A protein has these predicted regions:
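A charged, aromatic-enriched C-terminal amphipathic alpha-helix characteristic of glycosyltransferases
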Residues: 357, 713-743
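Nucleotide-sugar donor-binding/catalytic module of glycosyltransferases
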Residues: 2-248
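Conserved nucleotide-sugar donor-binding subdomain of glycosyltransferases
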Residues: 417-485, 514-535
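Short hydrophobic beta-strand element within catalytic cores of glycosyltransferases
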Residues: 663-666, 673-677
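Donor nucleotide-sugar binding/catalytic pocket of nucleotide-sugar-dependent glycosyltransferases
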Residues: 498-499, 506, 530, 534-570
């Protein structure tokens, strides 16, 4: 008997039924208390919000029903159906199908996980392609971590979607075959097509019920499309049944195969495929008998079975191969899930030290976590991080990480060396380009820039790298919104993800368009950016304005404001003579802002102060072949302290961009007088009103600079005001306290 236990949430009797959802997720459960909460949580986190979850409990005797009830009380999308006695997974799924209301139905097992973007991605692609059935690739992982995670379909699909016809589908389900078993996949099916085909699960099957349903549906004309997206996480553990075979299960599969032949129209190609699968079932039955006899010590009986069925005996090589593989792999890696305080930082940045604003901010956050006693690991899942650098030298600042690993790199002391020789070739070409440009023999620009690694699309090998190395983290820190889709591949549902957003990328497009420029990094539309951010448990925003934008778009998401902390010097200094300083990396906001300063501000400053000198530090210098008189381009500088000490005035003339301008806070911490635009002060303008001179008009900007150059006393007074503000508002405790406590509580 089935009892529905969600009437109270659906309303009183006679109330209008709720609108049908896009997707009904069907979940059969039998004694699944160990994993069902995580499975349901992964469904609740879907970016496709318009769904229902139908859990059919198949006579469980553990507390899994209580777990589902508790979650259903908090989320009306979850419905629970209960069976007094176990009737098997097919019967449970038929019960769920009978009450499903979605346009599509998706199967998720109670011990598995799905990626937050899975349902939206599959549904969008299936509808665009006209598929009735959509399946994705499976990431297969072992609960005890004795085998590395792997993808099921990657070799079959080769990274591209593929239509699967019925004979190919049947043939792939040969037992102990070399081809991936498509019957293991968990389908998304158009419900109306399934209804018209009059297909249901075979309730006599203890395993292989998804294969049978899809084979029957395809025999009645439904079209199956397989996609390479690695978004279903299939868990292997000691009590799961889907990968275990015994005599009774194989007998049920043989009987099902016979019924299938009798009920569908069998073409010659389908007949051949069915025969391959049927022979594999027969061989597997003999193999199971041989293994059982060997375990009982009935050697002669096992030998006779092997002689009668050489194919069955040949399957013993699989067991031997598995044992040899296990021996070659060595003892199982100790489980890491018990390691308290382990924080894994996922990043595609080229982080080697405080060489640019985003690296400075990330390392500052990490130092605060380290001071709290947490263990930090830097994990770079993509070799694209190297760009055109054949090696990266890690500065002493990287000691904040207990371990630094980048895929495609060798660690040798403080060096990370790219394994791909093409990177060295690119570096040599780039060096040649710069030399020829400097000698005026050839203009620059003929060497194609390396892609912006931070926003690059992840490959399956990146995902598997995270799955193997981030497993068991207490918390995940995603460096930029682009990294949040990688966090679930840590396969640790209890580990919260904190995304360090750095910038609100979707605001940058309009900002650059307003000044007739193009961003040097990635562009994101607001919908996609907020969707990426929503996949994290908490967003770490660098300033209030962007935090407010996230809260407005994702009202149920935790947002932590954590501006860059600064360590103030003891006292302000006036600097030396008419010396100005600008510090910046080679990014579009710095390039555009500096050009504006050169064209609109610098001539006025030089007219009033002919001895004025502007020192530019950082690789922004690479963007300028020529500079105005009085400008010195230093390039990257290992130690900025002497430059700040000598500078009379620090300028930040940015006219576009987002985030908190890291160099503004750094300069204030050095006790320097500063002139900045409103873009440079975005998010902290009111806070810094008393200690930074603001100007968006070029003449006013120049007047502020000239006035400060003329008065050492004014510079010192403004520098002291800056130090006072830093001490009160930008100490590590003030900036990072909430973030550190949130992540420390979750990671411990």
């Amino acid at each position: 008997m089935i009892d529905l236990v969600e009437e109270a949430r659906l309303g009183a009797a006679g109330a209008a039924p709720p609108r049908a959802p896009r997707v009904s997720v069907l979940m059969a459960n039998h004694n699944g208390s160990a994993f069902i909460a995580d499975a349901l949580a992964s469904i609740q986190r879907q970016t496709l919000r318009d769904l229902e979850v139908i859990v059919v409990d198949d006579g469980s005797r553990d507390d899994s029903v209580a777990i589902v009830r508790r979650l259903a009380a908090l989320d009306p999308r979850i419905r629970l159906l209960e069976r007094d006695r176990s009737a098997g997974p097919g019967a449970a799924r038929n019960a769920a199908l009978a009450v499903a209301r979605g346009d599509w139905v998706a199967v998720v097992d109670s011990d598995d996980l799905i990626h937050p973007e899975r349902l939206k991605t599959l549904l969008t692609k299936a509808q665009a392609d006209g598929a009735d059935i959509a399946v994705d690739d499976l990431l297969i992982f072992s609960e005890d971590e004795t085998a590395p995670p792997r993808a099921l379909l990657s070799r079959m699909l080769g990274g591209a979607p593929r239509w699967i016809d019925l004979p190919a589908f049947v043939r792939s389900n040969r037992l102990f075959g070399r081809e991936p078993v498509l019957g293991f996949t968990k389908p998304l099916i158009r419900r109306e097509a399934l209804r018209l085909a009059a297909v249901a699960y075979d309730e006599a099957l203890p395993v292989g019920e998804d294969y049978d349903l899809l084979a029957r549906a395809m025999a009645r004309g439904l079209r199956l499309r397989a996609y390479p997206d690695l978004t279903y996480f299939y868990r292997k553990h000691r009590v799961s049944i889907s990968h275990r075979l015994d005599e009774a299960r194989l007998e049920a599969m043989a009987a099902n195969a016979a019924r299938y032949r009798a009920e569908v129209e069998v073409s010659p190609t389908l007949d051949a495929a069915l025969s391959v699968r049927e022979r594999s079932i027969t061989a597997a039955r003999g193999f199971v008998r041989i293994v059982a006899d060997l375990k009982r010590g009935a050697i002669l009986k096992a030998l006779r079975t092997g002689l009668r069925s050489p194919t069955s005996a040949a399957l013993l090589t699989i067991v031997v191969g598995d044992r040899l593989t296990a021996l070659a792999r060595g003892p199982a890696t100790p489980r890491r899930t018990s390691a308290a305080g382990r924080v894994v930082v996922l990043s595609r940045q080229r982080v080697i030290g405080s060489t640019n604003g985003s690296s400075t901010y990330l390392l500052s956050l990490c130092r605060a976590l380290k001071a709290r006693g947490l263990s930090l690991e830097f994990l770079g899942p993509s070799p694209g991080t190297f760009g055109r650098w054949p090696w990266m030298r890690l500065t002493p600042e990287m000691a904040v990480f207990d371990r630094v690993r980048v895929r495609g790199g060798w660690r040798v002391g403080d060096l990370l060396i790219a394994q791909d020789p093409a990177v060295l070739g690119s570096a040599l070409l780039t060096g040649l380009e710069r030399l020829l440009a400097k000698l005026k023999l050839k203009s620059s620009g003929w060497v194609k820039p390396a892609p912006y690694a931070v926003s690059a699309a992840a490959a399956d090998v990146d995902r598997l790298y995270v799955a193997e190395r981030a497993r068991g983290a207490g918390a995940i820190v995603a460096d930029y919104a682009f990294l949040t889709p990688l966090a679930p591949y840590a396969l640790t549902p209890g580990a919260p993800c904190f995304v360090v957003m750095h910038d609100l990328f979707s605001s940058r497009t309009a900002s650059f368009a307003a000044v007739g420029a193009t961003d040097s990094v990635a562009t994101l539309d607001p919908e996609r950016e907020f969707e990426l951010l929503s996949q994290a448990d908490a967003v770490v925003a660098i300033q209030e304005t962007e935090a407010a934008a996230v809260s407005a778009a994702n009202p149920n998401q935790k947002v932590i404001v954590a501006p860059l902390a600064a360590t103030p010097v003891a006292a302000a200094s006036p600097g030396e003579g008419p010396l100005l300083l600008f510090v910046g990396s080679n990014t579009a906001p710095n390039v555009v802002g500096l050009r504006w300063f050169f064209d609109q501000v610098w001539p006025t400053v030089r007219a009033a102060q002919p001895e004025a000198v502007l020192t530019v530090a950082g690789n922004v210098s690479r963007a300028f072949a020529t500079v105005p008189p009085g400008v010195r381009m230093l390039g990257p500088v290992p130690d900025l302290d002497p430059l700040y000490a000598r500078a009379a005035v620090v300028v930040s003339p940015l006219t576009t961009g987002s985030g908190l301008k890291i160099k503004v806070i750094e300069a204030l911490g050095r006790g320097k007088a500063m002139v900045a635009t409103s873009v440079s002060l975005q998010g902290v303008e009111e806070l810094l009103r008393s200690c930074v001179l603001r100007a968006d008009d070029p003449d006013l900007f120049a007047a502020h600079v000239v006035g400060l150059l003329a008065s050492a006393d004014r510079r010192v007074a403004q520098g002291e005001a800056a130090l006072d503000r830093v001490r009160r508002s930008f100490s590590p405790e003030a900036c990072y306290g909430e973030f550190v406590e949130a992540i420390a509580g979750d990671a411990s």
